[in-house]
């Protein structure tokens, strides 16, 4: 494919219209100039032709990205760089033209930030490899990958494919556009900040070199952007692969391997893309399930949504719970979790009972509502006057009978086990 005149494809009306629609669809926060995505249309109407001419003449200067720190589950922070809306628009236009070119080069076992690919496909491929006897895992952790990409190495790799100097020029300008941290400017000497529309593609271009090296060595692997695992047949082979691939990453790609987090392990000790793995002795194969940390995160969020002191209606709590349940199961549906779903269902119902019991407030109101739900008057009276120990009351059999699964479903609650059973691909 001729890649010597790509700038005109990038600046074509059709490509720019698609880029605009995508940026507006993604919404997103303002960059350093404070412009909102809703203001982009008017801005481009006035300045679009000027921007196009600046890009053609290599005179366009991207603005610095705005640094935003996102807390990590492990206690650290992830640095995001938020470009201006205008720069997101231009980056999106570039990515739309470059992506089809690089899709022809990318490895079939690379799944992150690629069209029609997802984390679940990576997990299923990894399971296939494990069940073919490759049940020693090399889990390589790249230390602050997006913050440490070497610009010269990346541009050299891009230059092997892209021959349009105008495109090469603007991509490099985005890499060195700088960062604003609390109103202080900082040069971006290395890295491709997460948050830009080009960043995922540039990450895959860089790490495709790793994919090619692993393929050349005949290794079984899956990669989701910078999250890579290699499956081999023995512990000795796994340790050798860890040494050799780590050396390649550091010496050839100029990246840093975090040796304290990288490890050689069995599938049972692995956490990958939120999934854990176990060996099903009946089926004689490895299977996936939500990792314990993913379950703990779900429970924490569920507890927040069912907090009795949260001053919103119970119907609103159910609405938010349903969003959490659907999103979580949609992601983990390829995993085995029937028992887990039943346990979580029971926990959710228990916490909603406490919310409802508190909402009923007075003993008289509680007696009336329990009787409406079919509870005998004497039992309703005893239950209502048990005391203020809401957690204790809502564990009693009478409450399980009065506010049961069917009644909560009628109230609008999505049952995890029912939703999972409908969607599950492994049941």
Tell me the role of every PLM-derived stretch.
Residues 176, 252-320, 324-326:
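A conserved non-catalytic segment of reverse transcriptases
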Residues 30, 34-100, 104, 113:
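Active-site substrate-recognition loop segments, prototypically the cytochrome P450 B′-helix/B-C loop
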Residues 54-69, 73, 108-117, 121-271:
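Conserved polymerase palm-domain catalytic core
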Residues 88, 92, 96, 100, ...:
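Short, residue-level hotspots on alpha-helical faces of the histone-fold
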Residues 1-45, 49:
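Non-catalytic, polymerase-adjacent accessory regions of viral genome-replication enzymes
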Residues 360-427:
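Extended C-terminal regions of large enzymes
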Residues 26-33, 73, 102-106, 135-136, ...:
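Short acidic (Asp/Glu) and glycine-rich catalytic loops that position anionic groups and cofactors
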Residues 317-363, 367, 371:
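Non-catalytic, peripheral interaction segments enriched in hydrophobic/basic residues
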């Amino acid at each position: 494919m001729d890649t010597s005149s790509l700038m005109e494809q990038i600046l074509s009306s059709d490509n720019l219209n698609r880029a605009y629609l995508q940026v507006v669809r993604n919404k997103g926060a303002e960059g350093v100039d404070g412009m909102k995505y809703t203001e982009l249309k008017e801005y481009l109407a006035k300045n679009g032709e000027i921007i196009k001419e600046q890009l053609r003449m290599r005179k366009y200067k991207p603005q610095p990205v705005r640094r935003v720190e996102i807390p990590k589950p492990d206690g650290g922070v992830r640095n995001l760089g938020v470009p201006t809306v205008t720069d997101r628009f231009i980056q999106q236009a570039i990515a739309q033209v470059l992506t089809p070119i690089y899709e022809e080069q990318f490895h079939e076992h690379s799944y992150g930030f690629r069209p029609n690919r997802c984390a679940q496909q990576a997990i299923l491929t990894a399971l296939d490899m494990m069940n073919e006897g490759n049940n020693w895992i090399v889990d390589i952790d790249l230390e602050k990958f997006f913050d440490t990409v070497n610009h010269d190495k990346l541009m050299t790799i891009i230059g092997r494919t892209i021959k349009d100097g105008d495109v090469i020029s603007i991509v490099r300008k985005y890499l060195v556009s700088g960062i604003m941290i609390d109103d202080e400017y900082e040069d971006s000497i290395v890295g491709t900040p997460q948050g830009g529309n080009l960043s995922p593609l540039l990450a895959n271009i860089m790490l495709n070199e790793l994919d090619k090296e692993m393929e050349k060595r005949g290794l079984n692997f899956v990669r989701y952007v910078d999250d890579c695992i290699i499956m081999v047949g023995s512990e000795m082979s796994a340790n050798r692969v860890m040494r050799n691939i780590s050396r390649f990453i550091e010496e050839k790609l100029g990246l840093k391997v975090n040796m304290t987090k990288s490890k050689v392990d069995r599938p049972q000790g692995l956490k990958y893309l939120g999934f854990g793995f176990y060996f099903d002795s009946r089926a004689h194969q490895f299977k996936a399930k939500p990792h314990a940390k993913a379950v703990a995160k779900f429970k924490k969020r569920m507890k927040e949504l069912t907090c009795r002191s949260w001053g919103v209606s119970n119907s609103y709590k159910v609405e938010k719970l349903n969003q959490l349940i659907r999103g979580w199961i949609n992601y983990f549906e390829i995993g085995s979790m029937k028992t887990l779903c039943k346990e979580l269902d029971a926990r959710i119902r228990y916490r909603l009972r406490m919310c409802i019991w508190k909402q009923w407030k007075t003993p008289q109101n509680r007696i009336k509502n329990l009787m409406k739900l079919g509870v005998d008057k004497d039992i309703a009276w005893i239950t209502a006057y048990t005391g203020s120990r809401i957690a204790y009351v809502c564990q009693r059999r009478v409450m399980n009978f009065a506010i049961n699964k069917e009644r909560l479903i009628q109230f609008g609650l999505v049952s995890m086990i029912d939703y999972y059973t409908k969607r599950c691909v492994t049941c």
